[in-house]
């Protein structure tokens, strides 16, 4: 595929799967976990990836919340590093534009890490 075909394929893939992506994001938002404790997020994301045909290796580098997912063979090789941790004290109800915690003092997502 040429560059424009690749671009169209990617946009179509995102559009075709937007409900799945949004549900995963919302699930991670509703279950905020601090750094190195993101077990729910890891299971959510790796399950989604495995169901989409990715090969997933969990516990990478001795970290139970780290994983590598691979799809296909050959080139191009595309990689990225992502975070899905919440921050302490940022509990926030979804769709609220003012401080409105689910639980006062609890962790929450304030940096978009749930959007992976």
Describe each PLM feature range.
Residues 3-109:
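Acidic/His- and Gly-rich active-site-bordering loop/insert found
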């Amino acid at each position: 595929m040429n560059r424009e075909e690749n671009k169209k394929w990617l946009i179509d893939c995102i559009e075709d799967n937007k409900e799945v992506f949004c549900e995963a994001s919302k699930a991670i938002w509703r279950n905020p976990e601090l750094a190195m404790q993101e077990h729910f997020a890891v299971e959510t994301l790796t399950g989604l990836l495995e169901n989409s045909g990715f090969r997933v290796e969990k516990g990478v580098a001795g970290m139970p919340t780290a994983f590598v997912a691979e799809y296909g063979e050959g080139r191009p090789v595309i990689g990225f590093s992502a975070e899905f941790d919440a921050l302490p004290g940022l509990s926030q109800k979804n769709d609220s534009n003012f401080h409105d915690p689910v639980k006062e003092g609890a962790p929450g997502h304030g940096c978009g890490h749930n959007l992976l």
